[in-house]
Amino acid sequence: MGLLLLVLILTPLLAAYRHPDFPLLEKAQQLLQSTGSPYSTNCWLCTSSSTETPGTAYPASPREWTSIEAELHISYQWDPNLKGLMRPANSLLSTVKQDFPDIRQKPPIFGPIFTNINLMGIAPICVTAKRKNGTNVGTLPSTVCNVTFTVDPNQQTYQTYTHNQFRHQPRFPKPPNITFPQGTLLDKSTRFCQGRPSSCSTRNFWFRPADYNQCLQISNLSSTAEWVLLDQTRNSLFWENKTKGANQSQTPCVQVLAGMTIATSYLGISAVSEFFGNSLTPLFHFHISTCLKTQGAFYICGQSIHQCLPSNWTGTCTIGYVTPDIFIAPGNLSLPIPIYGKSQLPRVRRAIHFIPLLAGLGILAGTGTGIAGITKASLTYSQLSKEIANNIDTMAKTLTTVQEQIDSLAAVVLQNRRGLDMLTAAQGGICLALDEKCCFWVNQSGKVQDNIRQLLNQASSLRERATQGWLNWEGTWKWFSWVLPFIGPFVSLLLLLLFGPCLLNLITQFVSSRLQAIKLQTNLSAGRRPRTIQESPF
């Protein structure tokens, strides 16, 4: 009985669900084509979905090399021979972490973001690092680089401290040296490289005061009014406009070139301690990686794109920007946008989940709650169908207004045409005067009106189906969704009250008969004949 009631309740709910009316899409597409809408005739700007060539890389300009900001990530490794220097080494390491806020201690995630990227154009600056045991990130060919800086990563540098200097701020040596092609640098008299960028912390050891004699001009990247300068002390690039004077306010704290050279360095701190007879003892090693902090900029290394370069990297890289591959599709090209009709619509099989009817009112109450959820979803779908129908009506009215404007404009154009024909009647009309082959206008407003009428009919049909059904009466669905969860427990209680006494009576008779049979069997097994009422002595 409960299963039959469940089926009766679920049947109208499942029947209320229907697939969307996909011919509406076909009508809308035909309407756009017949009205000559720009959405159906203009070119489409599309991005490539191919995974082989995900995009194209463009190199950064020399000025962008001076403005793109980089950041450093530091990691350290203890020397296994610390022994008695563990406490002072910990003190020195805590000083390093506190005094250099421009260095991040969390290591970044390495690896190429994209591969098979093509570099368009010539890169003004490339940086090459060669290390036998380094991490290869990719190599650009020399033909795409205007100026190539070669980093000498084989330099191993240590900073020496005595035991009583552990509490002072450490000063690391300058970054590794870089070499340049012959004739690239010109010694120009300028003080532009001196000073410190305003965005840099005063405790940053990478921007120590620069030497005046170490500020050199890169001839291949400079012009008469604009100079690209290299500070060999800090391995940083500066852009100077000779007509506006020197100003380093826009210079980032850590530049790209400085970060790339620092990431190839091998830095360590040693100490002269009395524990080892005042001999030079290594304490710990620093490994520094670099990342681009400016949004949209990447390291371009060969055909790979990186956001960060690991410590001890090797290869040839430049910086630039990446754009996805874009192609222009003409208006008459069929784009891969599937539009289905009723006959082509792939039907989705919907499985109906039946709750097993087990004993207990709790299971039946859960069934009522499930029915309420299905009803709520059906009501939501109906409301969505109404909104879609309203939107279609609005779109049809808008297209009707556009068509009326086009008809009005066509009437004005034809009126002007008649006037021009009268003025050029001696030459056979404006068409012959201009030697035009197509001089006729085909009025297709009737097709547009027919398509709009069909679109409105489809919207009206969709709205009627959404408002039909015993669960969609206007004004009842708002309170019915609250009452429906109590129907399951109420019906279960009603069934229990109707059939409970009968079931209890049957169970009582069954138990009584079984007890009488057991008692009779017990008397027979004891050898006594049961007495009837007539044989009783009483």
Curated annotation (Swiss-Prot):
Glycosylation sites noted in the Swiss-Prot or TrEMBL record: N133, N146, N177, N220, N241, N247, N312, N332, N443
GO (cellular component) term, any one: plasma membrane
UniProt cross-references to SUPFAM superfamilies, sorted A to Z: Virus ectodomain
Disulfide bonds: C43-C46, C43-C439, C431-C438
InterPro entries: TLV/ENV_coat_polyprotein
Site (described: Cleavage): R350, A351
GO biological process: syncytium formation; syncytium formation by plasma membrane fusion
Stretches of the chain found on the membrane's Extracellular side: 31-478
Gene3D superfamilies, alphabetized: 1.10.287.210
UniProt short sequence motif CX6CC, positions renumbered to this chain: 431-439
Transmembrane segment boundaries: 479-499
Keywords: Cell membrane, Cleavage on pair of basic residues, Disulfide bond, ERV, Glycoprotein, Membrane, Signal, Transmembrane, Transmembrane helix, Transposable element
UniProt motif CKS-17: location: 414-430
Residues of the signal peptide: 1-15
Pfam families associated with the record: TLV_coat (PF00429)
Region (Fusion peptide): 354-374
Post-translational modification: Specific enzymatic cleavages in vivo yield the mature SU and TM proteins.
Residue interval(s) of motif CXXC: 43-46
Ranges facing Cytoplasmic side: 500-538
Superkingdom as given in the UniProt entry: Eukaryota
Annotated family: Belongs to the gamma type-C retroviral envelope protein family. HERV class-I FRD env subfamily.
Job of this protein: This endogenous retroviral envelope protein has retained its original fusogenic properties and participates in trophoblast fusion and the formation of a syncytium during placenta morphogenesis. The interaction with MFSD2A is apparently important for this process.
Description of its domains: The CKS-17 immunosuppressive domain is present in many retroviral envelope proteins. As a synthetic peptide, it inhibits immune function in vitro and in vivo.
Note: In contrast with its primate orthologs, this envelope does not confer infectivity to pseudotyped virions. This is due to a N to T transition at position 532 in the cytoplasmic tail of the TM protein.
Summary of subunit composition and partner proteins: The surface and transmembrane proteins form a heterodimer. They are attached by non-covalent interactions or by a labile interchain disulfide bond.
Protein name: Syncytin-2
Native species: Hylobates moloch
Lineage of origin: Eukaryota, Metazoa, Chordata, Craniata, Vertebrata
